[in-house]
Amino acid sequence: MELENIVANTVLLKAREGGGGNRKGKSKKWRQMLQFPHISQCEELRLSLERDYHSLCERQPIGRLLFREFCATRPELTRCTAFLDGVSEYEVTPDEKRKACGRRLMQNFLSHTGPDLIPEVPRQLVSNCAQRLEQGPCKDLFQELTRLTHEYLSTAPFADYLDSIYFNRFLQWKWLERQPVTKNTFRQYRVLGKGGFGEVCACQVRATGKMYACKKLEKKRIKKRKGEAMALNEKQILEKVNSRFVVSLAYAYETKDALCLVLTLMNGGDLKFHIYHMGQAGFPEARAVFYAAEICCGLEDLHRERIVYRDLKPENILLDDHGHIRISDLGLAVHVPEGQTIKGRVGTVGYMAPEVVRNERYTFSPDWWALGCLLYEMIAGQSPFQQRKKKIKREEVERLVKEVAEEYTDRFSSQARSLCSQLLSKDPAERLGCRGGGAREVKEHPLFKKLNFKRLGAGMLEPPFKPDPQAIYCKDVLDIEQFSTVKGVDLEPTDQDFYQKFATGSVSIPWQNEMVETECFQELNVFGLDGSVPPDLDWKGQPTAPPKKGLLQRLFSRQDCCGNCSDSEEELPTRL
């Protein structure tokens, strides 16, 4: 192995481990980078922010935590949030323990003799729930009670929250979230691979130590290929989807030469690598079923947003540190308008559904076909319609897809064969997932009988394989072919409109999750003693001006550090 590759891998592994220090990869100036503004600087934000309970108190992670802190100051609200947490726990409880969990909820929160009776609950509804619980504890037993509890919290309690120091603190976090993002927000590490318009490399947020993958789209290459619409479409779809099973977009920014998408870093490699380069081709059935179930959940989340993926194949399914999968590369994904169909002969040969090959109209059926192809390949160790490393013309592959039934070996159990054959139905109207029930039809297949999808969706099931934390599951640095220089293309001022639409900075939910996961929220979210208002949250006070530097300090010290400055001597090199 070349010295350059050894050094690049060593530096990346050290960064993934948190740099070996107490700061876990954070810059030594991270508190300065994430310093709260005085609340008076958030006035415009306060006036413009939409007052939506679901968005501010449920969907946004920091908003949810701060609303819970507010509720903890009032006993009647504490009971409501404790009930909601109890319902969440009930929904992911294993089947055999769910009835006992439901009884505890009924006794604690819904009984007149219970210690934490929640307010404004119709007694008839409680009685119905108790009866249904004894008949059979279904996962959605408390759905209506949950809705009513949120409805109660969204009225007077929500209005009181908006006038509290907890909401003011939320405004400070939102102010930080909306600060400009530049290349200096990150440290850059080794190249991991290539995308359609440029390299993909590992990167790390200086302020938090969080690792990501940075997908660079070279501006000249985009312009030469007229790829502006495709690039913006991928960015906007990634921004819209919030799923445990689809890579998340955390930041979008621009440099002089490139547009950059900062995405979830998946250290475990892709399924193509694991199917074909980790011993005998293919997986044991249990492992293939686990991945198929997680992919099904990812497709369900995409389809819920009316997005058809259209490029499901092994190399686009990535593993994280723990062995869970995420769908990646949404360049061919497209939104399907409500009540309409779309048309487009796009995808990868061997994974395109018959209706796509025939250039017919469709909605979400191509994704369920591709899931069948992928499940088959994971079990058989080869694609259903083309053998690995065997050259076969595109026309012949497409003929097989349209006309010839796939063959099954004894590696397939009867249930695995049943699911594959139903997903690989040539007629989309008969295909599993396309009969009116969507993902629910697929989840209810007997092959998934032993899987608790609620627990799977919460990340509570142990994956069958965990990647080696000391391994780099990608090609050597020198084996990744470099892009040639784009010639004959000039960037013009009119291109800036497109760049501004693309480079929108931080994405709310992933950014807030980053603050929570890296413990920045926990360390910075401090209020005054005994509930007193800290100076930075006092509307009557004024921002404290930083002390003036002396002449010698201004001459010899570095510029004050904001979130976008380069870091000090503790930083690692940005390019190897």
Curated annotation (Swiss-Prot):
The active site is at 311 (proton acceptor). Its EC number is 2.7.11.16. It comes from the Eukaryota. One of its GO terms (molecular function) is beta-adrenergic receptor kinase activity. Keywords: ATP-binding, Kinase, Lipoprotein, Membrane, Nucleotide-binding, Palmitate, Phosphoprotein, Serine/threonine-protein kinase, Transferase, Wnt signaling pathway. It catalyses: [G-protein-coupled receptor] + ATP = [G-protein-coupled receptor]-phosphate + ADP + H(+). Residues 186-448 form the Protein kinase domain. A lipid is attached at residues 561-562, 565 (S-palmitoyl cysteine). This is G protein-coupled receptor kinase 6. It comes from Mus musculus. The gene is Grk6.
